[in-house]
C-alpha cells in the first residue's frame, strides 16, 4: 500500500501492489469448501435468517392481533391471495424506518419492518397466461408500521421499483392504505431534502403499464396521490380516501373530524373517485386479480352462452 491517510491521490498513481503467489506457506491453496459441512449454518447466515424472520407475520403477533381486532387482514395475506404461490420476490425487506436518533436498531427492526412498504415482483394468474405475461409488480403499504406512512427509505424502495416497472413494462398493483408523508424520520446518513422521485416516477407509468389501485381502510395525503394516478381504483366499503387527513384539516382551522368522516365511500363513489366498490378486503383482491387478467393476453380456453338467442331480442313488430 503506497498511500497513507491525508495523501493526495494523483491520476495513474498506483495505490496498492498485489503480488501473485502459487502457494500459501508451502501448502496447496484451497477455498475451504471441500471439508465444510453443507448443513452448517454459520452465525452470519443465521443473523440474516433471523432478520428476515422478523418481517413475517408469524413473528409479529401484536401487530396481527391489532389488525385482526378491526376485522382487517395483514398486507402479506393480501399479497398471498393475489400472487401465484411461492412467486413473490420481495425487494429490500430488511430496511427499517430512518429514525435512528429516536430508537435503537432492535426497536426499529421489530416495529418498522421494510419501512412499512412490502414490495416486489410476482406471477399473477400464471395458470392462465405464460411466464412473461403473468409477471407483475406489487407494492403494498403496511398500516401496522407507523400507520402506513411514507418514510425516506420506503420512498427510495419505490423509486427503484417504479423504475423497474417502467423498464420491463410490468403491470403494477398498489395497496394504498396509509396516512401519507411521515414527519418523524431523521436525517441520519446520506440525505438530501426532496431527493426521491416516487410521485414523478409513478405518474410516468400511467399509459405505459396497467396501474391497479386497491384500498381498504384509511388512505390520506401522499398515499392518495399515488392511488389517484391508477387507471382504476378498487375500494372496500370500509375505505376512506382523501388528500387531506384529519390532522391536516384541523391544522388548517377547518374543524375536527374522525378519519371515517373524511372521504367515506358514500361520498367518493357518487363523486366518481372510486371505480369499483366491493364489500370487504378479500373481494378487493379478487377483483384486482380479475381486472389484471384483461391485460395479460387471450385465454386458451373459454366458453360463452349461445349467441344465437340474441337474434330474438329485438321484436319483429316494433310497436308491440
Language model regions located:
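A structural preference for short, pocket-lining loop segments at secondary-structure junctions
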Residues: 122-142, 157-184
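Conserved catalytic cores of soluble enzyme domains
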Residues: 22, 176-300
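Short histidine-centered loop motifs in beta-beta connectors
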Residues: 1-7
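Short alpha-helical segments and helix-capping/turn motifs at coil-helix boundaries
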Residues: 104-107, 115-119, 155-161, 197-198, ...
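Intrinsically disordered, low-complexity segments enriched in small/flexible residues
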Residues: 21, 27-135, 140-146, 267, ...
